Structure formats: C-alpha cells, structure tokens
Amino acid sequence: MNFMVMERRLFTFCFLAVVVWQSVALAAGTSSFTALTASLDEAIEAHRHYVAVREGRIARLKCQLLDADTANLSFFRWNGEIYKEYKTYICDSAIHYLRVNLDWAERYGRQDAVLETRLELAHLMASAGMYEEAAELLRQTDKASLPSHLLPDYYNACHKLYTELSFYTLDDSFKKHYQALATHYDDSLMQVLLPSSSLYLERREAREAAAGHPDEALSINDTRLAHAKPNTPEYALVTYQRSLLYRRLGNREEEKRYLALSALTDIRLSITDHASLWN
C-alpha cells in the first residue's frame, strides 16, 4: 500500500476516534468515564506506535515467509499468519495472502486446505462488498463433499453474503429474497454449531436483538463479555455489540461507555475495520 493511502487511512482512523472521544466526553460525569476518556485520548495520541507494532509483526512474518520453501506446508502456514495480521488491518492485503494460499493448496492438491481457504476467502470478500466474487467461490464449493467441521464455515459465509446483499440492495423484491436466504443459512448454521461456541452465542444474541428482546440479548452478551479477554479483537467486537444493545434499551451512558471501550481496543490493536468508530 502506498504512503498516501496509508496516511489517509490513519487520518480517517484518528478523526473517527476523536468523534467517539467527544461523544463519550459529553456523556461523562463519573470518575469511570473520566478515566476512560483519558485512556482514549492517550491511545489516539499513540496510534502511530500501535500501527508500528503491527507493522513490525508483519515484517517479521514476511521474513519467515522468505525463508520458507514454497513447496513446503510451512509456506502455506506463514502466509496464513500474515493474512491474520492483515484481516482487520488492510483488507486488500488480507485478500491477497488468502488468494496465494488458495492457489498453493490447489497446486499441491491439499483438498482440505482448498476448501477451508476458499470458504475463508468467500466470507472475507462478502464482508468487503465483493459479492459476486464471494458468490462464485461458494458456487465452486460442493456442500455435500465438505467435511463436517467445515459446514459451519460454509453456512456462515453464505449467511454473511446474503445478509450483506439484503442490506445494500435497493430493490424490495431482492431484499426479501436475500433476507429469506440469510435466515435459511442462519438456521442451518445454528444446527451445526456447538451451543458453547462463541459464534453460536453471537448468533443467539443477534437473534434475540432482532426479535425485540434486548434484555435477553444483553444476558447472552454478559456471557460473551466474561469470556472475552481485554485488548483482543473479540473484546472489541463484543463491547461494540453491547453498545448497540444499550442503545436499544435507551441507556445512552452505557452505550457510550462500551462504544468507547471498543474504539479504545481497536486503536490499541490497529484494527481499521472499526465498526465502533463509524457508529
């Protein structure tokens, strides 16, 4: 990525963080809010340090990749580690490294790796608005041939694609069609997930919220939050979703608190797929 694009992303990132900071500051009045706004302010000031930390990890992984034999499984694994670093940081780079892994798996006949990587790429592309590309990858996937452990990935990718399509289409007929497909794949997903899994709990929470039961959704979020370690992507996601539940409940103070916690985590981890900052 060129310097100007990176600078623009950093500017947008910091601008949105300041907006969140100001919103939280307006809601402040307790010592906990004061401490939180101070932490957010410090993180905004230090954002370039956090970016440098992530870039350092990526650089070290790329050095490992250079030393790997392209015919060896280690090449696939190092590519996968680089993809994970880019996933919530720079989407087009994440797509590139997943595509490299998909090509590698196809070239060397690693069918399990082909299927797993294809589904991961389909989900990522659907998240990035590359709907036709995601749909094509899913069309290339024969559900009947999938091992059972990949069925959740398949249904989750399909659910993601049709949820995104239903949200962005301007045609009411297509919206209803996509919503029906999203519901179908969500039902299928819930049937193959372990009830104790993080994705199962996330989907249950979303269902309760969509059904107009924010208190029940918040109870599920309590469980998720208890298991989410601070300063992790999971914590950023759970706190953001918690802020949305408090909004539904009309609790603006708690909404802003958890929105700020999510934004703070995003900044510290250099997560630029920052839903909390766009809210």
Language-model features: locations:
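Charged, low-complexity surface segments at secondary-structure and domain boundaries
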Residues: 1-2, 46
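Bacterial N-terminal signal peptides that target proteins for export
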Residues: 3-13
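Intrinsic disorder/low-complexity segments, especially N-terminal tails and targeting/processing regions
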Residues: 7, 21-22, 26
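Bacterial N-terminal signal peptides
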Residues: 13-22
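A "functional boundary" signal
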Residues: 11-12, 25-279
